[in-house]
Swiss-Prot record:
Residues involved in NAD(+) binding: V11, D32, K37, G76, A77, V115, S116, N117, S140
Keyword NAD annotated: yes
Swiss-Prot/TrEMBL GO biological process terms: glycolytic process; lactate metabolic process
Name of the protein described by the UniProt record: L-lactate dehydrogenase
Domain of life of the source: Bacteria
UniProt-listed InterPro entries: L-lactate/malate_DH (IPR001557), L-lactate_DH (IPR011304), L-lactate_DH_AS (IPR018177), Lactate/malate_DH_C (IPR022383), Lactate/malate_DH_N (IPR001236), Lactate_DH/Glyco_Ohase_4_C (IPR015955), NAD(P)-bd_dom_sf (IPR036291)
Amino-acid biosynthesis keyword on record: no
Length: 306
C-alpha cells in the first residue's frame, strides 16, 4: 500500500513516524514546500528503518504521489496561541484552492484524509475542490477528542480506555458535543458505574477535552503525538478494510435533519472510505447541541470566499 503526506510539519511528521513504526504502509511519499527541511526530516526518518519493518520513504513532488491509496493532508497555516480553529479558515482555503486541484491531477481516485484545521471546514473544501465521491474525502474529525474523552473518563473509573465506549461528535472545536447518554462500559451506563459523580465534575472533564488543544498549543506550540496515532488508526481502518467505527468527519447525508456540512459522527470506515453512518439515538439536549454545532459550521462555509 502507498500513502502520501502533504505537509511535513510537526503533525505531518508525527503521522509519518506513527505509521512507519506500526508498519502501516509499504511506501510513503512526503511533500512540503520547504524542500530543505523536508529532506532533513526524511533522512532522520529513514535512518530508523533498520529498527522496524521496512517502509520505502522518500521526499517527493506532487507528481510522486501518483498511485497513492491514501493522501493525508496536514499542510496549512499553523494555529496561533489563542486562535480558534475557525479563525484559520480563509488562510487555509487559499492554500487548498491551489493544492487540491494540483493533487487531483496526479491522484484522481485516491482516498483523501484531511487533518489540517479547521478540519471540518477543510474537509468540506477538499470535497468540493476535488470532485471525489463524498465517502472518499474524510476528516480526522473528533477521533482525537473522542480519545481524550475516553482517556479522562477511564482514568477516573480505573479501566483501560479501550474498554470504555464514549463519543465526541459534531465540530472538532469549540461547539463539539459530548454524548453523555451513550457513555458505558460493557453496556453499563456511566450513571450506574459511578452514581455519586458530581455533574460539575463531569462538566470539568468535558472542558478539559474541549480545551486540550489550546492548552497544549500554549505550552509547546502544537499538538502532534496523539493526532499522529489517531491518523494511523484511520489509515489502517481504510487500507486494511477494517470496517472500524470511528468519529471521522464526513459530509452529512440527512442524519438528524442536519444541514449540508462535514462534521463527526460514528462512522464505519473501510477500504471504500466512509461506508455508512451510525445514527445513535440522542437526547433532546444532545440533538440541539449537534444542530448548533452544524449551524456554526454552515455559517463559516457560507462565508468562504471561493
Amino acid at each position: 500500500m502507498k500513502g502520501s503526506i502533504i505537509g511535513a510539519g510537526q503533525v505531518g511528521m508525527a503521522c509519518a513516524y506513527s505509521m512507519v513504526i506500526q508498519n502501516t504502509l509499504d511506501e510513503l511519499v512526503l511533500h512540503d514546500i520547504d524542500r530543505n527541511k523536508l529532506e532533513g526530516e526524511v533522512m532522520d526518518l529513514v535512518h530508523g528503518i533498520p529498527f522496524v519493518e521496512p517502509t520505502r520513504i522518500r521526499a517527493g513532488e506532487l507528481a510522486d504521489c501518483a498511485g497513492s491509496d491514501v493522501v493525508i493532508l496536514t499542510a496549512g497555516a499553523k494555529q496561533r496561541p489563542g486562535e480558534t480553529r475557525l479563525d484559520l479558515v480563509q488562510r487555509n482555503v487559499e492554500i487548498f484552492k491551489g493544492l487540491i486541484p494540483a493533487l487531483m491531477a496526479h491522484c484522481p481516485d485516491t482516498l483523501l484524509l484531511v487533518v489540517s484545521n479547521p478540519v471540518d471546514i477543510m474537509t468540506y473544501v477538499s470535497l468540493k475542490l476535488s470532485g471525489l465521491p463524498a465517502g472518499q474525502v474524510i476528516g480526522s474529525g473528533t477521533v482525537l477528542d473522542t480519545a481524550r474523552f475516553r482517556y479522562l473518563l477511564a482514568e477516573r473509573l480505573g479501566v483501560d480506555p479501550r474498554s470504555l465506549h464514549a463519543y465526541i461528535i459534531g465540530e472538532h472545536g469549540d461547539s463539539e458535543v459530548a454524548v453523555w447518554s451513550k457513555v458505558n462500559i460493557a453496556g453499563t451506563p456511566i450513571g450506574e458505574l459511578s452514581p455519586d459523580w458530581d455533574p460539575a465534575y463531569l462538566g470539568d472533564i468535558f472542558e478539559q477535552v474541549r480545551n486540550a488543544a489550546y492548552e497544549i498549543i500554549r505550552r509547546k506550540g502544537a499538538t502532534s503525538y496523539a493526532i499522529g496515532l489517531g491518523v494511523t488508526q484511520i489509515v489502517q481502518a481504510l487500507l486494511r478494510d477494517q470496517h472500524r467505527v470511528l468519529t471521522v468527519s464526513s459530509l452529512t447525508q440527512g442524519e438528524y435533519d442536519l444541514p449540508e456540512v462535514c462534521l463527526s459522527l460514528p462512522r464505519v470506515v473501510g477500504r471504500q472510505g466512509v461506508e455508512r453512518t451510525l445514527a445513535m439515538s440522542l437526547t433532546e439536549s444532545e440533538r440541539k447541541q449537534l444542530h448548533r454545532s452544524a449551524q456554526i459550521l454552515r455559517q463559516v462555509i457560507d462565508s468562504i470566499r471561493w
